[in-house]
A protein has these predicted regions:
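Extra-cytoplasmic beta-strand recognition segments
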Residues: 16, 60-97, 130-136, 171-172
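Short carbohydrate-recognition loop motifs
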Residues: 34-64
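N-terminal extracellular ligand-recognition/capping segment immediately after the signal peptide
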Residues: 63-64, 205, 209, 216-291, ...
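Extracellular beta-strand ligand-recognition surfaces/modules
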Residues: 131-167, 172
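Right-handed parallel beta-helix/beta-solenoid
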Residues: 175-207, 247-248
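Small/polar beta-strand repeat architecture
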Residues: 177-184, 255-278, 337-351, 360-367, ...
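Extracellular beta-strand/beta-solenoid scaffold signature
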Residues: 256-284, 304-313, 339, 351-354, ...
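Right-handed parallel beta-helix
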Residues: 292-297, 319-330, 369, 425-436, ...
Length: 572
């Protein structure tokens, strides 16, 4: 900041060549005496050192020289008044910068210091520079701290000491040197000050670490100024950080902002809300000094499924983590298109009820695909596959007899896909809306894990499924106070295909939810189910329409508690 440039302030007083009537021999206030026609003052047009200058004989104690101009005093502005002086003859005086502090009512603020450090002239002909810094601030380096009462000043210098000496004074300068105080004024450091290039090619990780270390030790924050910063390793900020520039880093590396762990920070860091969400979610599975990724009520538009295991780089985690307080929207994109494969396979229940063998084209079958075909029950999914052995592992046994048949494997696409986790326990999703827009399904659970929890969430218009379990990741799952709103509300009951929830394992707690016009609310394959206080209605607009099951139990020994539910236009 330089007020002379940015605001056009005129700081430097007129040169002596403009006339000595512009210079006061008193305080510089209106009506005070000037140096015009004074016997002890003269303008010298061609001094060897100064060019034009003022020659002044000291006849008063002190001998004052002040500009009549009113230099503004502005909070946050630092002024340096300087003058070059040399003794010509006679006694050698001392020289100091001086001023007159003027209040808004044009009275002198006598309580503030109005003189700067004194410099003794010791040799005739030697050029000496005197200066002083004036500001409203009392920071170190300020010679005259004036506070907020003075609003202007008349500046110049004083000659002190014995009278009789003659000096020459170069034009007095007043300059804005606020920039010299910026580092003390600012509570941040720039990564470029520590060697970061921001060219998108050079690895700036070491500079980021150095800036963070300095910021932590000095209780300031870090600024990532404009540029593109390549980080080729993990980087952790233990200090607060603000991004004007962006970062790029390989997918396997993490940016951990432990004091600014929020979507706004990661969006700024990576240049888009979608990439910011993915990167913020990535570090949730590591140490960020947080257990919750709070989206702050933000909406994130996703152009494709988020493979959470691939994003995190992990396949197991048993520590509690929470994604909360936001909305995920499925953008219009071909990335949501279902994938499908058809293969001939053999089912031998006497050998393994969960396995298909001799599967043709097994490489084309995606883990998480729903299996359909003769002898296949409800909500049977591919849990894993072995390309070399030509086998597919199923989430549930088939009801059909042994034999070789053709099966279809359909892979739905989900906003959040946890199927890459071998085991994930105690993960929670709270206060989230999954706005599927008929483009995508909502959440696919991990292969195994205990205590996955949904609370106060809305599943809006899933294309195929709301919550899908392809294994035992639903063991002890909580679904509390959620809404499931179908994308098929206008269709006849018999034409609907979407399912809100399926569960394979035991002990889910499904409570106080509202479910609107799906083909089915829940397909439950385990036992120990607890369904309390849910309202699920699956009617249509037909006069005498077909009714289907709201809840389907696929095993005979269900050991289930169904209490206080509103079962509307459907059955169990």
């Amino acid at each position: 900041m330089n007020k002379a440039i940015t605001d056009g302030l005129v700081l430097t007083p007129p040169p002596f060549s403009a006339g000595l009537n512009l210079w006061s021999r008193e305080d510089g206030t209106p009506g005070s005496g000037s140096y015009a026609n004074q016997p002890n003052a003269a303008y010298v047009p061609a001094d060897a050192d100064f060019g034009g200058c003022l020659e002044l004989q000291k006849t008063a104690i002190p001998q004052k020289l002040r500009s009549y101009g009113e230099t503004p005093i502005i909070p946050g502005l630092y002024l340096r008044v300087s003058a070059r002086v040399k003794a010509i003859s006679g006694n050698l005086p001392s020289v100091r910068i001086a001023g007159w502090a003027g209040a808004s009512n044009n009275t002198n603020v006598s309580s503030v210091p109005q003189v700067g450090p004194s410099v003794q002239l010791t040799t005739h002909g030697e050029v000496v520079t005197v200066s002083a810094i004036i500001s409203t601030s009392n920071r170190s380096g300020v010679d005259m701290a004036w506070g907020n009462t003075p609003v202007y000043g008349h500046f110049g210098l004083d000659l002190t000491g014995a009278n009789g000496g003659v000096v020459r004074i170069d034009d007095i300068e007043i300059e804005d040197i606020t920039s010299a105080f910026l580092r003390d004024l600012m509570d941040w450091v720039d990564v470029r000050d520590f060697g970061a290039k921001g060219d998108g090619v050079t690895n700036d990780a070491a500079a980021f670490d150095a800036a963070d270390t300095y910021a932590r030790n000095n209780a300031v924050s870090v600024l990532v100024s404009k540029g593109t910063y390549f980080l080729n390793t993990n980087v952790t900020f233990t200090s607060k950080v603000r991004f004007e520039g962006t970062v790029t880093m390989p997918a396997q590396y993490r940016l951990s902002c432990t004091r600014d762990y929020n979507l706004d920070t990661y969006e700024a860091a990576f240049g888009s809300e979608e990439e910011g969400f993915r990167r913020g979610l990535q570090v949730l599975f590591y140490f960020t000094d947080h257990t919750v990724f709070d989206l702050g009520g933000r909406r994130v538009e996703l152009t494709g499924p988020v493979d959470v295991a691939a994003v995190s780089g992990l396949n197991t985690l048993a520590q509690r983590r929470v994604l909360s307080n936001g909305r995920l929207d499925a953008a219009n994109s071909t990335a949501w298109n279902n994938a499908s494969a058809t293969s001939v396979a053999t089912y031998t229940p006497n050998s393994n009820v969960f396995r298909l063998t001799a599967v043709a084209n097994v490489a084309n079958i995606e883990v998480g695909s729903r299996v359909s075909g003769t002898g296949v029950g409800r909500e049977v999914y591919v849990t894993s596959k072995d390309v070399g052995a030509g086998t597919v592992t199923l989430s549930r046994p088939l009801w059909g007899a042994a034999g070789t048949r053709t099966y279809t494997f359909t892979r739905y696409k989900y906003l959040l896909d946890f199927s890459g986790f071998t085991s994930l326990g105690k993960f929670e999703i709270t206060d989230m809306e999954f706005q599927c827009n008929g483009e995508a399904s909502a959440v696919m659970l991990p292969k195994s894990g205990i205590g996955f929890r949904f609370a106060d969430c809305t599943f809006n218009k899933p294309k195929d499924r709301g919550i899908t379990s392809i294994g035992d990741g639903c063991q002890g799952m909580f679904i509390d106070q959620c809404q499931f709103i179908s994308n098929e509300q206008s269709l006849r009951v018999q034409d609907r295909t979407t399912i809100a929830v399926n569960v394979n394992a035991n002990d889910p707690k499904i409570r106080d939810n509202r479910i609107v016009r799906f083909a089915h609310f829940a397909i439950l394959s385990g036992s120990g189910n607890l369904l309390v206080g849910n309202h699920f209605f699956h009617g249509d607009d037909e006069t005498a329409g077909v009714r289907r099951a709201g809840i389907v139990f696929t095993q005979p020994n269900v050991k289930t508690l169904i209490t206080g539910n509103y079962i509307d236009n459907c059955f169990i």
